[in-house]
Design a protein with these regions (language model features):
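RNA-contacting regions in translation and RNA-metabolism proteins
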Residues: 1-50, 63, 67-85
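Glycine-centered tight-turn and secondary-structure capping sites
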Residues: 54-58
Length: 85
């Protein structure tokens, strides 16, 4: 079993969390745009699932970003989460 790189680990984490939250897990897509020191993790979900991923007053999105920040500290690479409709 090969070890995942930091960006792949971050993508997998976001995908698992999003699939657990939404009603249409088959429509969850996670892609990464890598830069030298920063990677943008793009999360795409079904339109009707946007509220479940964002949460009231953005609380779920903030919690997901907090977890992603913890991964970035360990990896010494900055990750930014973008939630795309």
């Amino acid at each position: 079993m090969t070890e995942l790189g930091p960006t792949d680990s971050a993508k997998e984490l976001i995908e698992r969390i999003a699939r657990a939250l939404v009603d249409h897990p088959d429509q969850v897509r996670v892609t990464a745009v890598q830069g030298e020191n920063t990677s943008v993790i793009e999360l795409t979900v079904a339109k009707e699932d946007m509220g479940k991923v964002i949460g009231k007053q953005g609380r779920i999105a903030i919690a997901i970003r907090t977890l992603l920040n913890n991964v970035s500290m360990k990896a010494r690479k900055r990750f930014v989460l973008e939630i795309i409709e």
